[in-house]
């Protein structure tokens, strides 16, 4: 599986999708829209890429998830490439790709620069760790976007929280909140998706589990940038509504108008030693009332 993932990446750099071991009939999407790999942007624009910074492999399901920074010609402004692949009899039957180029693609966060170092920590867990069972990792994935699974999850004090490679710092719209990176949390009030794709990749060795959820929300102005806030996070949206009214009344800065949006999310969790060790929220935004072709 490692060789197949690296082969996908190498074929992009070589601009040669024909070298991929595709099944006679395969499913493929790029940034949520279906396309033949021969028509995808990744094979046209990526000029440099190395090995995955994060690689989760599910030997039972024949699936893998990978993420890394890639160059599309400008090494100073790299792109985050994320992908999920399914293999049957050494042939690719499913390929789900996302290319995030800046903060707006995700909704707030992004750092292709920080990604390699942050993800490297997760690829080298302690050798003496207590691994979670496949059944528990599945249940963890099921609970992530569930409205009925009330799994209680312990969070490690050093749990790494990232969004698109970035250890998120949020000083708030008034600029007076903490400048320390945010930590992980397992809140009771979280975005839900009853049609979430659960346990797409379960890596029992490293403790990774990958889940997909389609999350409706709204893009709000946020200081001089913008932020995607899921509809389920009502208090956060209400607070932002207040700030928007204050800002409009003061008329001191220009802000983007609020818009409805949908977050296509591939979330990665890492769990071992009986605690959540890492949480990665990876989103690609589209318009309101959208869904996924994988459903």
Label the model's feature ranges.
Residues 1-295:
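C-terminal and inter-domain tail/linker signature
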